[in-house]
Amino acid sequence: MALLDSLNRRIKARVDDDDPEEYSDLSSSEQDGSDADSDELEGSEAASDGGSDDEELSDSSAPEDTAIDASLNQISFGALAKAQASLGLSSSSSNNRRKRKLSTDKEQGPSPLDDIRARIRATREEKSKSTASTTTSKDKKDLPHRSSKHAPTVQSSKHAVSRKRTVVDATAISGPKARDPRFDSVVLSHGTSNPQALGNAQAAAAKNYSFLNDYRDAELSSLKQQLAKAKNPAEKEQLKRTIRSMTDKIRTFERKQREKEVVARHRRRERDLIREGKKSTPYFLKKGDVKKEVLKQRYEEMGAKDRQKSIVRRRKKVAARERREMPDMRRTG
């Protein structure tokens, strides 16, 4: 057979000098052997349909395989290198042919897949540009940032001033506030011949509604009578609380009235001194001086026993206040 003849042939490769004729002979012999092998395989497939032919081929293939293995063991490394080089050349030529085919396809015209790829690429570029613009705008908005909440606010000088002007702040006005015209300064000053002598609106209202003090005193006396007649302890406690609240209000009102009288008396005295030419500038009383003057006037109006009780009570009150303000170590020591 041709395959056995080609395999049994002894080939000796020259190391120093490569002969192209031997290389061509080797490649042709290998091609012939491969063709023969393919023909033999096709014959074996065709003969596989018959049972007797298969048995004969199987019996004859066993010694042939052993002969092929023995002949392959005797092939030199130079022949194997030349065969490998020939296979590499054939693969490179096939790659070149494939590249030429692709180039010719491109020269023929653009395919629909290329159009789709181009559209996808364009949409991606547009999306990247839009995201970049949004990030830059966000960065610009975040530029005036304070280091802490106590730091002053930073604002660009290019900020345009609004043309609108807030005349009335709607947020400050929670709702329409009720106004009583009886206590309005305009109403109280209207119809009087000398508003300056009358004083402010509060003084005028106190003068016009002074009868309320009489009503308050009458109500306090009636509550004291009810407390004397009451027998229920809960009712007594409620009446005591009401009487205490009313007496505190009356005492506060009287104290404010005394302070106003002291201030008015001092202003009249200072005005008279300036009119007489004894003083050039008036002297205004401080709040502490006004309280001292009111306390002095109150002690003068009291009796001896009441004055002594009030002084003792005031001393205890001041001592308790000083004890509360004193540190714990000094308080216990």
From Swiss-Prot:
Start-end of Basic and acidic residues biased regions: 102-129, 319-333
A Pfam family recorded for this sequence: RRP36
Positions of disulphide bridges: none
Localization per record: Nucleus, Nucleolus
Any one biological process term the GO annotation gives: maturation of SSU-rRNA from tricistronic rRNA transcript (SSU-rRNA, 5.8S rRNA, LSU-rRNA)
Ranges of compositional bias, category Low complexity: 84-95
Keywords: Coiled coil, Nucleus, Ribonucleoprotein, Ribosome biogenesis, rRNA processing
Composition bias, Acidic residues: 32-43
Role, per record: Component of the 90S pre-ribosome involved in the maturation of rRNAs. Required for early cleavages of the pre-RNAs in the 40S ribosomal subunit maturation pathway.
Subunit structure: Associates with 90S and pre-40S pre-ribosomal particles.
Official protein name in the record: rRNA biogenesis protein RRP36
Lineage, top ranks: Eukaryota, Fungi, Dikarya, Ascomycota, Pezizomycotina
